[in-house]
């Protein structure tokens, strides 16, 4: 039997603060002075999600492709900035390449899902495009950041080995190939682990959201399968593209290592 989603109001948000207060009190009891940090994080959580809620309500009411694309562009830009800051905040050119890499990988996987599987009445339907992009982009941002940071660290820590390969005639791509494969493999471990335990240990956002909204649990499970495979493909594409971009930051036009 399906029931409508129980709506929460501002008074309920006040009660939610009790959860934050309990966490702060427990940490203070353990001698961890994280009160300011947690209050700041909690305040940002409330403010950001309330603003996003109102903003998305406006976008949904407009039903305009340009409004939807603006939202996606903002999400992509923030993801690229966060990934750049994790990998190499001093690089000026890395942001643009990350923006293209994350955007292209997300567009490829989402395009397949929308055209072949979901087939919404309008390609820009915000009901599907915005939440799907948000779930996928958040995951691929983390995977790309992990792969890029791991590869950058490996190059910085092993300059002699890389230069030895270069002296023996290897190209930059060949010289760092083992580090790149290790970085891609490490970045995909969380995704694979999540796929192994989904439905057993954790109930992901798409599934729980539809069930809470009164949707059919089986249909929600099918949508979650789609999300998991979309995340896998997008993470794979983005880590391949990002690592290819990152290692080129460490070589000049003469194929010399810059570390």
Curated annotation (Swiss-Prot):
GO cellular component: plasma membrane
Entry-linked PANTHER family: PROTEIN ALUMINUM SENSITIVE 3, UPF0014 INNER MEMBRANE PROTEIN YBBM-RELATED
Residues spanning the signal sequence: none
Membrane topology according to the record: Multi-pass membrane protein
Residues spanning the membrane: 4-24, 34-54, 55-75, 98-118, 128-148, 195-215, 225-245
Organism: Synechocystis sp. (strain ATCC 27184 / PCC 6803 / Kazusa)
Subcellular localization(s) per the UniProt record: Cell membrane
Annotated protein name in UniProt: UPF0014 membrane protein slr1647
Family to which this protein belongs: Belongs to the UPF0014 family.
Origin: domain of life: Bacteria
Chief location category: membrane
Keywords noted in UniProt: Cell membrane, Membrane, Transmembrane, Transmembrane helix
């Amino acid at each position: 039997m399906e029931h409508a989603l129980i709506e929460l109001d501002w008074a309920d948000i006040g009660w939610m603060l009790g959860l934050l207060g309990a966490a702060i009190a427990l940490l203070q009891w353990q001698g961890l002075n994280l009160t300011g940090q947690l209050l700041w994080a909690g305040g940002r959580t409330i403010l950001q999600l309330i603003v996003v809620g109102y903003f998305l309500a406006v976008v949904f009411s407009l039903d305009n492709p340009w409004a939807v694309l603006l939202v996606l562009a903002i999400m992509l830009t923030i993801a690229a900035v966060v990934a750049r800051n994790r990998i190499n905040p001093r690089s000026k050119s890395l942001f643009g390449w990350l923006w293209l890499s994350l955007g292209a990988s997300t567009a490829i996987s989402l395009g397949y899902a929308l055209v072949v599987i979901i087939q919404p009445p309008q390609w820009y339907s915000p009901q599907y495009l915005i939440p799907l992009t948000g779930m996928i982009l958040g995951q691929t941002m983390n995977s790309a950041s992990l792969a890029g940071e791991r590869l950058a660290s490996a190059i910085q820590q092993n300059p002699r080995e890389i230069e030895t390969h270069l002296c023996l005639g290897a190209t930059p791509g060949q010289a760092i190939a083992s580090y790149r494969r290790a970085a891609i493999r490490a970045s995909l471990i969380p995704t694979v682990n999540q796929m192994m335990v989904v439905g057993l240990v954790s109930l992901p956002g798409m599934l729980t959201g539809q069930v809470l909204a009164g949707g059919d649990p089986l249909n929600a499970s099918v949508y979650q399968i789609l999300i998991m495979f979309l995340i896998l493909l997008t993470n794979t594409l983005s880590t391949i593209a990002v690592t290819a971009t990152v290692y080129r930051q460490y070589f000049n036009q003469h194929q010399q290592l810059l570390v």
